[in-house]
Structures are given as structure tokens and as C-alpha cells.
Design a protein with these regions (language model features):
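Short phosphate-binding loop-to-helix
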Residues: 51-107
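Conserved core of the sugar-phosphate nucleotidyltransferase
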Residues: 97-175
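Short, high-confidence coil segments that cap the C-terminus of an alpha-helix
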Residues: 41, 84, 110-114, 193
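Catalytic phosphate/metal-binding cores of nucleic-acid and nucleotide-processing enzymes, i.e., regions
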Residues: 1-4, 82-83, 109
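N-terminal glycine-rich phosphate-binding loop and ensuing alpha1 helix
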Residues: 2-48
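Conserved alpha/beta core of the MobA/IspD/sugar-nucleotide pyrophosphorylase nucleotidyltransferase superfamily
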Residues: 152-220
Length: 220
């Protein structure tokens, strides 16, 4: 199936400004994520409002878009410029993303129009608001939240979309919970779009804060 990877990235991160350019073992974060995604041999594009990121990745591999409310909306804008049936959205803070995870998400798009991934969550992460929890029944997602404690699995920042559903994202109703939780994926759930889920193996670090960056460096 005609599939491309989109990596939404911006410099104006609230918790960690210029995070995308922060170096991990001498390589900028967004470059490292891009390199990992390219290992799949799927066409890969960084989607960004920032010329600095375009200059780093190269104009042939980046799509410059205007203002967007979140990463999914950014990907929806980018989908207008390139012609693919399916898209995989990999967050720009995942330097340890693997080909296996991307392939697992892509495969499930044969069944669902929107897909995401999760991994089992350790007890210490369950009380951490930076760790997004997913409630699911093993087949589809039922809810996402940061403040959930004591149950749920760890939601990974990767999604799969069929082209038509991604294009429709901006037309879906936005509910208060999306704003409160700061979780754009709630829009699918609250508009009754079935989101397929797949359990994956992931032992890496997602770079949300400078502390995460330091933790990653120590593991190298």
C-alpha cells in the first residue's frame, strides 16, 4: 500500500523550547528521529512551520506548513501536498522508534482507518503526568489521559491514518477534554472514530523534557 511517514516538528515547544534541535550524542533530535524512520525505506517527511528545521532536514524531505493547532493538524495540512493512501505519524520526540513498531502500526491500517500503539506501563510512569495513558479493550482505544493513575497502558506517540480520515481531522468537533488533557487524539475518540490499537515492544525514551534528554545521554 502507498504509505509515507510524517514527522510533525516545531521549535516552539512549551515544556522544552527548541527541543527538536537539541543534540543527542552530537545529532539533533529531529535528525535522529528522521534517520530512524528512513530505516523503514518508506518515504519520510518532516512537517514543520520552522525554516530552521527545513534547512536541517533538506527541502526535498521537509514540508513547510503554516500555523496548526497540533501535530495531527500539521500532518493533515501536509497530506494536501503529497499523494499517498496511508500515513504514519511519528512524533519528533521519539529517537528510539523502531522499524518493527512502524510496520506493526502500518499493518493494522488494513482493518482500521486510525491506528495507534501502546506498551505496558511501569508503576512509576503511571503517576507521571508526562506519561500519556491509554485505556483500551485490546482492539480499540477507549480513552487517553495524563492524570489517570493506577491503571492503563503507556501510549506511544505514533499513529496511522488512511488519507481520507486524516483530511477530515479539521472538520471534527473539538471537545473540552481535548484542551484540558492537551491530547489531540481524543478528538477521534469523542467523534466516534474507531481507533485500532497494537501492543508493541518499546524500551526507549521519549524526549519530553531536558531530564529525558539527560537520561537518554546517560544510556548511550
Amino acid at each position: 500500500v502507498n504509505t509515507a511517514i510524517l514527522i510533525p516538528a516545531r521549535l516552539a515547544s512549551t515544556r522544552f523550547p527548541n527541543k527538536m534541535l537539541a543534540e543527542l550524542d552530537g545529532v539533533p533530535l529531529i535528525q535522529r528521529v528522521y534517520n530512524r524512520c528512513k530505516e523503514t525505506e518508506l518515504p519520510t517527511y518532516v512537517v514543520t512551520p520552522d525554516n530552521e528545521i527545513v534547512d536541517l532536514i533538506g527541502k526535498d524531505n521537509a514540508i513547510l506548513v503554516g500555523d496548526a493547532e497540533n501535530g495531527t493538524a500539521r500532518c493533515s495540512l501536509a497530506a494536501d501536498f503529497i499523494n499517498y493512501e496511508n500515513f504514519i505519524n511519528v512524533q519528533g520526540d521519539m529517537p528510539d522508534i523502531t522499524t518493527n513498531i512502524i510496520n506493526d502500526v502500518a499493518r493494522l491500517l488494513g482493518t482500521y482507518s486510525v491506528v495507534t500503539a501502546y506498551t505496558k506501563m511501569s508503576d512509576d510512569k503511571r503517576s507521571n503526568p508526562d506519561s500519556v495513558k491509554i485505556i483500551h479493550n485490546g482492539q480499540t482505544a477507549k480513552w487517553f489521559g495524563r492524570g489517570i493513575t493506577g491503571y492503563g497502558d503507556h501510549h506511544l506517540g505514533i499513529y496511522g491514518y488512511r488519507n481520507y480520515i486524516l483530511n477530515d481531522y479539521g472538520n471534527l468537533e473539538r471537545y473540552p477534554e481535548e484542551e484540558i488533557e492537551q491530547l489531540e487524539q481524543l478528538r477521534w475518540i469523542q467523534n466516534d472514530v474507531k481507533m485500532g490499537v497494537v501492543e508493541v515492544e518499546f524500551n526507549g525514551i521519549e524526549i519530553n523534557t531536558k531530564e529525558d534528554l539527560n537520561k537518554w545521554q546517560k544510556q548511550v
